[in-house]
UniProtKB/Swiss-Prot annotation:
One of its GO terms (biological process) is vesicle-mediated transport. It catalyses: GTP + H2O = GDP + phosphate + H(+). It comes from the Eukaryota. Belongs to the small GTPase superfamily. Arf family. SUPFAM superfamilies: P-loop containing nucleoside triphosphate hydrolases. It comes from Schizosaccharomyces pombe (strain 972 / ATCC 24843). A lipid is attached at residue 2 (N-myristoyl glycine). The keyword Protein transport applies. Its EC number is 3.6.5.2. This is ADP-ribosylation factor 1. Its main location: Golgi. GTP binds at residues 24-31, 67-71, 126-129.
Amino acid sequence: MGLSISKLFQSLFGKREMRILMVGLDAAGKTTILYKLKLGEIVTTIPTIGFNVETVEYRNISFTVWDVGGQDKIRPLWRHYFQNTQGIIFVVDSNDRERISEAHEELQRMLNEDELRDALLLVFANKQDLPNAMNAAEITDKLGLHSLRHRQWYIQATCATSGDGLYEGLEWLSTNLKNQ
């Protein structure tokens, strides 16, 4: 009896854990986003070779966020991070019109992986502060998000340097994690 009450208490008030894989093309802003969420400030970044991992606390959820480098030569390594991933944050440079089709190809390739079949998908349409940035609707179209069947997804316009939109994205992840 005491054990079931403690399990109920844990499910209502306890901290949940969620493993997040944050990927996207190089220079999309993944590392800037990670440290803006973790530290609340902008850090000077260099291209990520390998990964950064940090725990971000939000709404009784402990997000373990794996920020994996996006250069084309190391994208094949992304698959080594797929196991036990509950959520994907795919970061897009909204100002990079020349590589949006490349981002689409990488996203589709990743979503076809069986290990990620149940993972939530959050797309951060980053760099919205730039004057020629594509809006979330245009990125939704160019990434083919409406054609995704049997997958929960959401797109959030963001600006990593100001933090705009980042917590709205985590809010969506936390709400949908609870529904899984």
